[in-house]
Amino acid sequence: MKKILLFLFFPILSFSQSIDHLFFEKGEINFSFQYKNKLQLNMISNIVSIDHKTNADLAYAYANQKQFLAFIKLGIDYEIIEKKIIQFENGSANNWSYYPTYEEYVDMMTSFEDSFPNICKLHHLGTLNSGREILIVQISNNVGVKENKPSFLYTSSMHGDELAGYILSLRLIDHILNGYGNTLQLTQLVDNIDIWINPLANPDGAYAGGNQDVWSATRFNADTIDLNRNYPDPQDGPHPDGNLYQNETNIFMGLADTVSFTISANMHSGAEVCNYPWDTWSNLTADDSWWQYVSREYVDSCQANSGNGYFEWSNGLNPFANGVVNGYDWYEVIGGRQDYMNYFKYCREFTLELSDDKTPDPNDLPELWDANYPSLLNYIEQSLFGLRGIVTDSITGLPLKAKAEIQSHDIDSSHVYSNLPIGNYHRHLFQGNYNITFSKNGYYPKTINATILNNSTNIEDVQLVPFSTTQVKEINPSK
């Protein structure tokens, strides 16, 4: 039995109608409105959550009751979109053409660790007020041991009704674990990268209608907050949405404080496009060429492996995008996870919009996997490329946490740091020649020159000389 989404448009509500009734069932509504220009759209995006389907003059948005009342005060005409849902019939677990119950999801995540204890560890990041958990698996050949490896992160479905990445992430975990030792690429990834995958970042939204299925999923979390507007923002600072940081937000910020991720991706659905930074402002990143390169690489592979017009997004806002877009050029997002990771955590994160259907027909999920899994693996592999090495004290040989900054290049927090306890740094760059300065309080800075080739690795270990060594030599010149 097919699930049919019927979008019914209703005219402006009279003020005599109860706003409470609109929010009784889900705590959020979906609506559309005409906007005059990008400036007005960006202003409105500070009030409500703009959705992916927005085009050159018509915007789609989500709002909780507080946000919707603020939007009404603008005096802009709108139409409520009521979704009447008839459930899809789940396919087979054997070919991943189904959405699990919440309990099945937990069992699957547990079974990954139980079946592959030498290379997989399940982390319980936190329990929500509902009792549902934020779960993540870590995959590495020496799982749980700090090594000279880049750490990579995939998360999906922080919008609870955007579930294409939920199943793809589960299948990706299964694919990597079963392929280790049997497939060269998968073995090399596990041996050389610390891989973290969280398939479901908003379980309360995904299972808003109960643990038995996802057909009543909501975009927002249980407190009707858009989690992708709830992070510290490079431009607007802490609490840009005016809300407390949600439990889910605190959990993932805590993870990013604990693990120094170098590359990550945040999976959504509702469009088919690779969205790279920034979302919050029009500034291009220092590494815009690199972002366009890896985004294009992801999309080109998807297009080649689908053969049916998949991932060819464009609209009136960017008619030449062909599946790749700068976030701000599309629409402004304030408080997004992507910009938080890039600006505050020095991690290269982009946003993957994996399907025009937010919750695809389960029977379409195998085809979605076939189109995406080579790209998902290739993006993980990007963790190995660029400039990398270990920074140590020239006297003691001990590892250092030092800043690595590229002269006349880095802007807006695009520099990186070496990470303890190893002292390893990872700087992902588009091909070219760069002067990189390493610095730390109490040490003389050191600048090196490095030539970078795309999809290649340049290893440059660096020793920093402490000030105290020079002072001792000056006092005791004979030594």
Where are the regions a protein language model picked out?
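A short, amphipathic beta-strand motif
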Residues: L387-S394, G423, V462
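Active-site/substrate-binding loop(s) of hydrolase catalytic cores
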Residues: K146-R296, D300, A304, N308, ...
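A short, solvent-exposed beta-strand micro-motif common in secreted/extracellular proteins
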Residues: Q431-G442
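Short, acidic Ser/Thr/Gly-rich low-complexity loop/linker segments typical of extracellular
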Residues: L398-L400, I406-F430
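Active-site-adjacent mobile loop/cap segments within catalytic or ligand-binding domains
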Residues: S264-A286, F320-E381
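Residue-level detector of functionally pivotal "anchor" positions at catalytic/ligand-binding pockets or at interdomain
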Residues: I395, V465-K479
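Structured interaction patches on ligand/partner-binding surfaces of diverse proteins
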Residues: N441-F467
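Sec-dependent N-terminal signal peptides
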Residues: K3-L13
